[in-house]
Curated annotation (Swiss-Prot):
Substrate binds at residue 260. This is WW domain-containing oxidoreductase. The gene is WWOX. Transmembrane segments: none annotated. One of its GO terms (cellular component) is mitochondrion. The keyword Flavoprotein does not apply. It is an enzyme of class 1 (oxidoreductase).
Length: 414
């Protein structure tokens, strides 16, 4: 089962496991009680811990609460066409303690994207995610789709994109999801994608700039720029520019830019303190894959912050995120050294679902409505590097990006 499986209800291990013969149930208004079938009695307190609990949040998308002829609450899963007396929210109970003031649900590095969206209905929301055919992008897209959103997977490889769509449809055949061609290494492809999306006459509520390359050998794109810089930054910059009018018409809208903690370990200015284009798009002789990636991730935060400063007055906010360290995904496929390193580190790192959590949080959290210009790690706001917070550098990068795009478009003109 789609949403329920990822909520963790298939895992029966618990610090408060019930004794034999006991069952956990919920009332109509969400209070948890315990049935002792051996003695045919019920009670509010957990038989071992003595705690009282209630369920947190609404039902998962596609679920409905009903009452049978005996007055007992049961739950209908309309997605998978089944009923159960087990409340799907029991994985998210909170202690009822009058001595403690109520606090909102807290998410951290162990949270999953499906947990973030527990009880949310995203019907009517249109979401674009770049690089969504695999890895964290795929988990992000799947999580949105399983909660009712219309999700567009913007992918360079349409065969893989369509495979990703089918994998989501296998989990829920009514998911609203499609793949569209987008190659961020080509400004022409970005333009074609934007035109194709505009022709659909759809709103755009959430744009997730997720796609990235890492560890690639030096090469120039068809636009004459170093590929890591163009794919990870400039292509996304151009995409947002082309879709800006739709985002503004769809407000409140959000942009989420996937960056990395590696942004802290680089510099993009020369000795005089000016933005250095030769560092952003280096020659083959000056190229090092790790530095190129780090610089592009610094660009991501600078871009997100400046985007928020420019568009937040129009109802469009932008935040940047770090998904997690050493997550095993396809991003490192171009460099065997990192493939080996990521493989060895895999048992100690986040899952893909956990890696998608911070993106999903920034895209949907009610408490972030109207708020932007921030950087998040493990679903919590944190301070990026001093350089990432430099407004003058952000403006310089914005102006450089606009100039590079104008130059490339000018070369195509007859």
């Amino acid at each position: 089962m789609a949403a329920l499986k990822y909520a963790g209800l298939e895992d029966t291990d618990s610090e408060e496991e019930l004794p034999p013969g006991w069952e956990e149930r919920t009332t109509k208004d969400g209070w948890v009680y315990y049935a002792n079938h051996l003695e045919e009695k019920t009670q509010w307190e957990h038989p071992k811990s003595g705690k009282r609990k209630r369920v947190a949040g609404g039902l998962p998308y596609g679920w409905e609460q009903e009452t049978d002829e005996n007055g007992q609450v049961y739950f209908v899963d309309h997605i998978n066409k089944r009923t159960t007396y087990l409340d799907p929210r029991l994985a998210f109970t909170v202690e009822d303690n009058p001595a403690k003031p109520p606090t909102r649900q807290k998410y951290d590095g162990n949270s999953t994207a499906m947990e973030i969206l527990q009880g949310r209905d995203l019907s009517g929301k249109v979401i674009i995610i770049t690089g969504a055919n695999s890895g964290i992008g795929f988990e992000t897209a799947k999580s949105f789709a399983l909660h009712g959103a219309y999700v567009i997977l913007a992918c360079r490889n349409m065969s893989r994109g369509n495979d990703a769509v089918q994998r989501i449809l296998e989990e829920w055949h009514k998911a609203k999801v499609e793949a569209m061609t987008l190659d961020l290494a080509s400004l022409r492809s970005v333009q074609n994608f934007a035109e194709a999306f505009k022709s659909k006459n759809m709103p755009l509520h959430i744009l997730v700039c997720n796609a990235a390359i890492f560890g690639s050998s030096w090469c120039l794109t068809e636009d004459g720029l170093e590929s890591t810089f163009q794919v990870n930054h400039l292509g996304h910059f151009y995409l947002v520019q082309l879709l800006e009018d739709i985002l503004r018409r769809s407000s409140p809208a959000r942009v989420v830019v996937v960056s990395s903690e590696s942004h802290r370990f680089t510099e993009i200015k020369d000795s005089s303190g000016k933005l250095d284009f030769s560092l952003l798009s280096p020659s083959k002789k000056e190229y090092w894959a790790m530095l190129a990636y780090n610089r592009s991730k610094l660009c991501n935060i600078l871009f997100s912050n400046e985007l928020n400063r420019r568009l937040s007055p129009h109802g469009v906010t932008s935040n940047s995120v770090h998904p997690g360290n050493m997550i095993y995904s396809s991003i490192h496929r171009n460099w065997w050294v990192y493939t080996l390193l990521f493989t060895l580190a895999r048992p100690f790192t986040k899952s893909m679902q956990q890696g998608a959590a911070t993106t999903v949080y920034c895209a949907t959290a009610a408490e972030l409505e109207g708020l932007g210009g921030m950087y998040f790690n493990n679903c919590c706001r944190c301070l990026p590097s001093a350089e990432a917070r430099n407004e003058l550098t952000a403006v310089a990068l914005w102006e450089l990006s606009e100039r590079l795009i104008r130059e490339q478009l000018g070369r195509r003109s007859p």
